[in-house]
From Swiss-Prot:
It comes from Listeria monocytogenes serotype 4a (strain HCC23). Pfam families: Mur_ligase, Mur_ligase_C, Mur_ligase_M. The gene is murC. The keyword Zinc-finger does not apply. HAMAP family: MurC. InterPro entries: Mur-like_cat_sf, Mur_ligase_C, Mur_ligase_C_dom_sf, Mur_ligase_cen, Mur_ligase_N, MurCDEF_pg_biosynth, UDP-N-AcMur_Ala_ligase_MurC. This is UDP-N-acetylmuramate--L-alanine ligase.
């Protein structure tokens, strides 16, 4: 039996796919840079070997699954090609893997990961389900009937998939290094829609998705009256959100989610719509929606000292706006401080004013240096260009996160798609030191 070797195994999709193959009984290993990523925890728990990149890792008998961030000139891929080993790109392998399942591809400019996680949780509790989530979580469930997968639009990679269903959460202009306009993004989504076998579930409040023209049913969901599945009577509380769902004007049920913001209501509504279409019991769906704990790096909360720290993947103006609004709902009486690390120079330059406008919805804004992706290392833009447009003109360094101590009782949002977690980790050390120092002072006073 071949061994599957993942080039770039710490990538979120790659990590999830490796876990799926491992669960299905295949031998799996992989390589990546010698730096800790949150995705590797699950790999280590499953005892999947992780090596540092080296051509010496590539031996006879391997099947290579190559991450899309790595060109054919990468040393491991070059060695594999020299040896005549099969080399398959991640998205193409996944496209082959989902055949034979009732597959559900979740895509959209925003909300893919959260919706895939929610769908996997709900459907997986009702029927055997394999899933691949973009937070690095994957499961190859034995006897699975369904396969839920996050489908990324970047470079049209999702066109490798021919799923049974697709959920389209929204269309927005992102990845400006590849997509030239929102029309370009729309064309990619419509092309995917034409490959879907049974039905597409699409946000009907999205003007772009309303333009879809397909030969299969398009089931629209949203807040508007014209949607087949409509969310109404939304009640936003500090513990979560309640709402009623109507299907073609008929009351379907009252639902509750332990999540915040309109975007999470819409994510849940898409899942409810698909489950109803598939005939899954509505009471089971209600029950499972209540117990979803979220996905990694999406409004992940840590309470420390007298502050609330939130880790979030938001890296587009629309996502920042949604994250700030969610924080306002859950913590209406607290000050909201945004700590943002822009991801890629191209995206930052393209949406510079949009970033400023969304960040300024917070009470205070701190900016980290721009994170260049694997595709792009340099740019003429600097973080100062964005800082000049935001409240306070604050730039924060990893070595000086103590500035955030100025905001007791605040919610601090650490947002970005790069490695903004290191800023949170540095700040948590500052908080730990402050707590220890305070304890020492109290001890000295007693003595």
């Amino acid at each position: 039996m071949t061994i599957y070797h993942f080039v770039g195994i710490k990538g979120s999709g790659m990590s999830a796919l490796a876990q799926i193959l491992h669960d299905k009984g295949f031998q799996v290993q992989g390589s990546d840079v010698d730096k800790y990523f949150f995705t590797q925890k699950a790999l280590e728990e499953k005892q999947i070997p992780i090596m540092t990149f080296s051509a010496d890792n590539i031996q006879e008998g391997l099947t290579i699954i190559a991450g899309n961030a790595f060109p054919d000139t990468h040393e491991e891929i070059e060695r594999a090609l020299e040896l005549g080993l099969p080399v398959i790109r991640y998205h193409k392998f996944l496209g082959q893997l989902i055949d034979g399942y009732t597959s559900i591809a979740i895509t959209g400019s925003h909300g893919k990961t959260s919706t895939t996680g929610l769908l996997s949780h709900v459907v997986g509790a009702i029927r055997p389900t394999s899933y691949l989530i973009g937070d690095g979580t994957g499961s190859g469930t034995k006897g699975a009937e369904y396969f839920a997968l996050e489908a990324c639009e970047y470079q049209r990679h999702f066109l490798a998939y021919k799923p049974t269903y697709a959920i389209m959460t929204n269309i927005d202009w992102d990845h400006p290094d590849y997509f030239k306009s929102v029309d370009d993004v729309f064309n990619a989504f419509e092309t995917l829609g034409k490959q879907v076998k049974k039905a597409v579930f699409a946000l009907g409040d999205d003007a772009e998705l309303r333009k879809l023209s397909l030969d299969i049913p398009i089931i629209y969901f949203g807040f508007g009256e014209e949607n087949e599945f409509q969310a109404k009577n939304v009640i936003k509380e500090t513990t979560g959100t309640k709402f009623d769902v109507y299907h073609r004007g008929e009351f379907l049920g009252s639902f509750e989610i332990p999540a915040y913001g309109d975007h999470n209501v819409l994510n849940a509504l898409s899942v409810i719509a698909l489950c109803d279409y598939e005939g899954l019991p509505v009471e089971d769906v209600k029950k499972e929606l209540k117990t979803f704990e979220g996905v990694k790096r999406r409004f992940s909360i840590t309470e420390k000292a007298n502050q609330v720290l939130v880790d979030d993947y938001a890296h587009h103006p629309s996502e920042i706006r949604a994250t700030v609004n969610a924080a306002r709902q859950k913590y209406p009486d607290k000050k909201v401080v945004a700590v943002f690390q822009p991801h890629t120079f191209t995206r930052t330059r393209t949406f510079l004013q949009g970033f400023a406008d969304s960040l300024n919805l917070a009470d205070e804004v701190y900016l980290c240096d721009i994170f260049g992706s694997a595709r792009e290392k340099t740019g003429n833009l600097t973080i100062a260009d964005l800082a000049h447009k935001t409240k306070g003109n604050h730039i924060i360094k990893e070595e000086h996160t103590e500035e955030l101590l100025k905001y007791p009782e605040a919610v601090i949002l650490f947002m970005g798609a790069g490695d903004v977690q290191k800023f949170q980790a540095a700040y948590e050390k500052v908080l730990d030191h402050e707590v220890l120092t305070e304890a020492d002072l109290k001890k000295s006073a007693i003595n």
